[in-house]
Amino acid sequence: MSQPAVTASSARQFRAGLNGAVVVFALLFVAAVMPVLWPNLPPAMVDYSNHLARMFVLARDGTAQAHPYYQVTWSLVPNLAMDLIVPGIGRHIGVEMANRLFYLLSQILIVTGAMALERAVKGRLQIAGFVALIFLYSTPFAFGFENFEFGLGCALWGFACAVWLQDRSWLARFAAHTAFVALLFTAHMFALGIYGFAVGLHELWRAWSQRASLRETFARFSALVIPSLLLAAFMVAANGSVGGSGNVWVFGDKATWILHILSGYNMVVSEIGVLALIWLITALARRNALRLEQSAMWLLAGFSALYLAMPFRLFDTAFVDMRVVVALALIMPAFVSVSFPDAIWRRIAIALAAAITVINVSGVMIVWLSYREDFAAARKSFELLPKGAIVMTAQTGDGGDPPTDLRDYPVFNVPTLAVHHADAFLPHLFTAPGKQPVTPRAPWRRLEFPERGFLPVRFLKYVAEHGAPAGTPPFVQNWVRDFDYLYLIGPSIPNPMPDRLEFVLGAPRFALYRIRK
């Protein structure tokens, strides 16, 4: 007669634990997006400022205030999510606010997309939301890869829809795949690749596990492949492109990058967080608390192989292999069911997820707060630039990109905001053909150098004193003659060329000089 009481007590404990997890998740979500919601906190992410500068150019296009050095040339290229969304909204609420809200929307898509996928696979929500919060400021996202983050969030939703519709009619699956292929191509090409790869692996598992006939397998894959083939044919007919042609493999760093994926600002924090997650996964696995669902092993094996094979730079897009790791980290929780041995282990898991999230977000807040003086000084420096100045950027360090201390990385692209505030020309504004719809006007194209890193100032000094050696990029061969001002980014150093540079303004992480003619 005591069993019903025990069962009722267990049910109450389960509901209490579930309600507690929901409350903790809600609080963690608010904490995780707090840096973006804080209006006076500068978003100190390396690519964010460069993207923001391009949004200003797009918002001004077609008006009397169109930029004197840059033009907008629309074509059939991917990676246009923010380019299509932010400028139009920015004309009504301000470009800076619109860009911040776009980044917030991308974060929401990442978290909700991971949760939607888990619900589609397991029929319930369990761990995916917590894992998504842990990775919300992982390396690709903390670097300000905005279109990729938005696209990956959409890809997670697309994968969830594919699982939801896997037993529906061919026409329903074809329509859904077509819609997501079009959406993801527009958002970010690599996010489209992640979506296609994940859905393809899931379909392979389904065909294998159900011993489907060749005819049925062909029919199912045709619903996935036909939209991609139509897109490819349309791109060929329209002379579209997907970026540059530079591919670079860095196999020696792949093991360490897994340890450094969790935080885009602090490698030690990332290492501790990754090792803590590995410990938790190992401890739960030893207690038979983890169960793989559906295509979990296929996804794990496929994405692991993809990570090993993927170059660091693909079509002139960097950190590509690290993006594979983040995608896998967001997908896998949906395919792993956890049966905690007891309430203590549930509390340990939630506490560990909360601790990693809070520590990671706190690190983000500390770095962003430390940049308030630099961003304020940058705005002041833009006021000191004459309208239409030709401005160059170089490093005080050794030319490393990224630098050894990732906390110094966000300053790299801050000077590009002079494109808007001073109508300036800068070689490093993102204007890569096949990736962005903004290009320099014809007279200035010889000076562009987008997405190719920042040269050390000692190299500029060598060119000024001895001439340009073979292989020197065109924009720097006659830099003293071609440019009016120079931003030196990185740790403060004495004036490296007093005879050629006149100090204008300094900040903790950069200095502005006028180039003497």
Can you describe what each PLM-predicted range is?
Residues P42-N50, G62-A64, Y70, P78-N79, ...:
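Transmembrane catalytic cores of multi-pass membrane glycosyltransferases
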Residues A53-R60, Q71-V95:
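Short hydrophobic/aromatic helix or loop-helix immediately within or flanking a transmembrane segment
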Residues L101-V121:
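Transmembrane-helix motifs of polytopic, lipid-linked glycan transferases
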Residues A114-L136:
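Transmembrane-helix signature of polytopic, membrane-embedded enzymes
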Residues F143-F150:
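Short acidic/glycine- and proline-prone juxtamembrane loop motifs at membrane-interface regions
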Residues F315-D342:
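Hydrophobic/aromatic-rich transmembrane helices and adjacent perimembrane loops
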Residues A334, V338-V364:
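Signature aromatic-anchored transmembrane alpha helix within multi-pass, membrane-resident enzymes
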Residues Y371, F382-P469, F475, W479-P491:
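Short periplasmic/luminal acceptor-recognition loop of GT-C membrane glycosyltransferases, typified by
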